[in-house]
Every structure is written in structure tokens, then in C-alpha cells.
Amino acid sequence: MAARLCCQLDSSRDVLLLRPLRGQPSGPSVSGTSAGSPSSAASAFSSGHQADIPVGRLPACFYSSAGPCCLGFTCADLRTMDSTVNFVPWHAKRQLGMMQKDFWTAYIRDQLLTLWEEGIIDPRLKLFVLGGCRHKYM
């Protein structure tokens, strides 16, 4: 089960926002609320967000304080949205000669978010998060 979400960095709050592909420009952050149950998670959104976020299409673990069981970053150029690629190998190919990172967290913190904050990543590039797990949809 996977939910396709768009990433957006909110530098004013220093959080990474995850929003549905066709949602409004705001959404739940990765740090998120510490909602433990699906019912309290759904109520964490304002009524304006509930119309935009298909809560029934997201896995139950998406709203847990630990986040989804599995996250995979993909990207697509806005000109060719139908052909998405895995972000990690794509970015690694662009950064040939870059020292290899052993830890995914360090890679995201040191490479992706730094480049994003500095505006180096091409604005035509859209990043998506695929959260997949064995949990049931809410």
C-alpha cells in the first residue's frame, strides 16, 4: 500500500511538508503530530485540509509519531511527470565524485535538504515520497 505525496520544504518552520499530489500547498509535516490512533490522526487536520487529503487512501501508520513504515523518495521532471525515477540513484549520478554516504539519514540531511534550502535543486523537479507498508488504509 503506497500513498504518493509531494515534498515541500517550509524553511520558516524548518520542517519538510508532505502533501497529496493534488492537494493544497500545505499538509502534515514529517515531524507531524504525535497522533497514536487513526481517529485522532484524522482529527489533527483542519476541516479545510480534510477535503484535500484523501485520508482513506493513506496507510494508518502514516500518522503515527514514528511516521510511515517505509519511505522511498522518487522524483520527476515537471515536463515528463509520467516517468518518475528513484531519487537516490538519480541524485548520485548527478553528483559523481561525491563521497558515498553510509547512512540514509545523513544523506538526506547533508545533501538533499541542504541543496533544497540553497535553491540548487532544479525548480522543475518535483520530489515525491512513497510511503508503503502492510497496514490497512484508514
From Swiss-Prot:
Keywords: Activation of host NF-kappa-B by virus, Activator, Apoptosis, Host cytoplasm, Host G2/M cell cycle arrest by virus, Host mitochondrion, Host nucleus, Host-virus interaction, Modulation of host cell cycle by virus, Transcription, Transcription regulation
Any GO CC annotation of this UniProt entry: host cell nucleus
Family matches, as InterPro entries: Transactivation_prot_X
Cellular localisation: Host cytoplasm; Host nucleus; Host mitochondrion
Pfam families (UniProt xref): X
Comp. bias intervals (Low complexity): 25-43
Gene Ontology BP annotations: DNA-templated transcription; symbiont-mediated activation of host NF-kappaB cascade; symbiont-mediated arrest of host cell cycle during G2/M transition; viral genome replication
Region (Mitochondrial targeting sequence): 68-113
Post-translational modification: A fraction may be phosphorylated in insect cells and HepG2 cells, a human hepatoblastoma cell line. Phosphorylated in vitro by host protein kinase C or mitogen-activated protein kinase. N-acetylated in insect cells.
Main location: host cell
Residue span of region Disordered: 20-43
Functional summary from the UniProt entry: Multifunctional protein that plays a role in silencing host antiviral defenses and promoting viral transcription. Does not seem to be essential for HBV infection. May be directly involved in development of cirrhosis and liver cancer (hepatocellular carcinoma). Most of cytosolic activities involve modulation of cytosolic calcium. The effect on apoptosis is controversial depending on the cell types in which the studies have been conducted. May induce apoptosis by localizing in mitochondria and causing loss of mitochondrial membrane potential.
Complex formation: May form homodimer. May interact with host CEBPA, CFLAR, CREB1, DDB1, E4F1, HBXIP, HSPD1/HSP60, NFKBIA, POLR2E and SMAD4. Interacts with host SMC5-SMC6 complex and induces its degradation. Interacts with host TRPC4AP; leading to prevent ubiquitination of TRPC4AP. Interacts with host PLSCR1; this interaction promotes ubiquitination and degradation of HBx and impairs HBx-mediated cell proliferation.
Protein family according to the UniProt entry: Belongs to the orthohepadnavirus protein X family.
Name of this protein: Protein X
Gene: X
